[in-house]
Amino acid sequence: MKKSFVKIISILLVLCMTLPIMASAMVAGEVSRVSVTINGDSATARGFCWYTDEKAGTDVQVAVVGADLTKAAIVSGVSYKAMEKYVHKAEVDTLKPNTRYQYRVGDSKTGVWSDVGYFTTPGKSKDEANFIVFADVQASNEENFQQAAKVLQSAVETMPNYEFAVGLGDFVNDCTNEEWDSYFRNFSFMNMNTTLVPVAGNHEGNLQWFKFNNMFNIGAAEDSMTVTGCYYSFDWGDAHFAVLNSNDMYPMSASQINWLKNDMNSSDAQWKIVLMHRALYSAGKNINKPDTVIMRNLLLPVIDELGIDVVFAGHDHMYMRTEPVKGEKVQVASTVTEYWNGESTTFALNPDGTTHILPSTAGTKRYGVNEDAMPPILESSALARDTKDGGVFATVSLDSNHFVYKAYMVDDETGEKSLIDTYAIKKTDRESINEDYEDLPTDIGSTVNQQGITLVIELLKMLVSYIKLLFSVI
């Protein structure tokens, strides 16, 4: 009896010592920071990224909604250590267009999986697209992440049929593990249940080398340097999107500009949209900074040349939308009012120019209007305002002839949503691909001379401008 008692006590002691270790191992294998992004053809491929605290398997299962996910094929990826954690990346390129999918990521050997997430692929036909746009969460504590998450929850409630979400950069403030954990924890309702289109912000790029690309699994352009982010493009519906990296070799590399020209000239989509972080048109505090001025001088002629319809940008934490502009001049367009999706909507008809939109910030760090912004900017604005009372999100719906944009502010105190701006475009014309266009070089070796010469010229231009300004003040 005494021996049996001692044996039982010994077993209990062993269990007491090993259970915490087992529990710790289970927690260590827990999946976090899950995101689904464009990686290849948007209709058939996705990139998955997630984190674990300890080394673990890198597996993903994807199945059509309604099928048994646990029986889906296991696709394995790669894992590496970064920021004292393990990054996991896997790609799936066998998806079907116009299909709703469920997925989970984790370790098939240990059976530690994430919660089930969802995403949708677009159709191959030129059908409608619906998406959410937000900018500059840039929080540094849990309270501010929670406040920004309320803004995006309102966005999802406003557009429950959204198919992807565009984040215009600066998801966090200092790129610490604590901030990224807080961001993904509070935004999991969106990040796990849609395709995210992330744009590299300066808070993920400046001296935060590789952190943007460690956080998302994106199909970057072939010659895109990934130190400070990346650039890439995709189609959705009858729209072609180019996602730029405004951290790229301040102010912007010749390689990236050449890529943008090649990319847009190869698309026959009705709508051509650019997504970037630092704005070309903004009444915010950063618009007169030298790097932004140079980038603006380099890119605006290209935007005009390519016939870009809309540019979405962030960075300045204030709200602004321009009239259609070309050559830094407002292009007046006629309007037509008609019912679209059950609403009476006034459309700008075939505008000859680009509309630049800066949808303020979804976060709590907000700035006012810079009255000293360059005259062409203030003169072109249809609306420029602060959003000090709440965070902002925007929705976009489009088809082959219509583009409808709406911006909302969510009050910090009441949580009530209010429509602060709306703009719509109707196109009855369609441009064909320029068959005579010849691709420009995009590799660094071929563009290094172009880069150096352009930078020197722009610096000299800026110096002359400052000298003129100085003499005008004296």
Name each region found by the language model.
Residues 112-168, 173:
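An acidic-aromatic substrate-binding cleft motif
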Residues 139-143, 172-177, 202-208, 249-252, ...:
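Active-site environment of divalent metal-dependent phosphoester hydrolases
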Residues 1-26, 455, 459-474:
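Gram-positive cell-envelope targeting signals
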Residues 270-311, 323, 329-332:
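Active-site-proximal segments of metal-dependent phosphoesterases and phosphodiesterases across multiple
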